[in-house]
Amino acid sequence: ALLKNPYDVIHSHYWISGKVAMPVAKELNIPLVHTMHTMARVKNLNLAEGEVPEPMIRVQGETQVVAAADALIANTDAEAASLVSLYEACPDNVLVVSPGVNLKVFTPGAGRAAAREIVGLDKDSHTITFVGRIQPHKGPEVLIRSIAELVSHSPHLRAKLIVNIIGGASG
């Protein structure tokens, strides 16, 4: 199918798809753009006590993908710096593209009140949500400490505050 419908670029996400994309990009002479999303070396540098490090096969795979990619997309300046310092990525090949949502385009169709009703949230509640891996470098404890501070200064918020922490270990 790729030979009949040529593409201008292959954009892989995560190291496993990057490994699959590498020979395809080479065979078809198509530039490979890769987004890591997470990096084993970064995760291994930030392990909490008792956490299992990412396997060496992942580190090796990520290193190979970084070397093969024509361009690397990082979500933040810190992520870009990690690609350069930990994986020896060429700085000229690393581009920072911050993730985000265009709120003028992507809004609850029926409005905020209807969306709250659909998911069972009180219209007067204040909702704070953390979504991500529950790991120290993701900062869930910052949220918890901040909420404790908020409630200590504004006790009236306690009755209307809904805090969601959604996530688990990586893997």
Where do the model's predicted regions map?
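Short N-terminal targeting/anchoring amphipathic segment
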Residues: 2-17, 21, 30-33
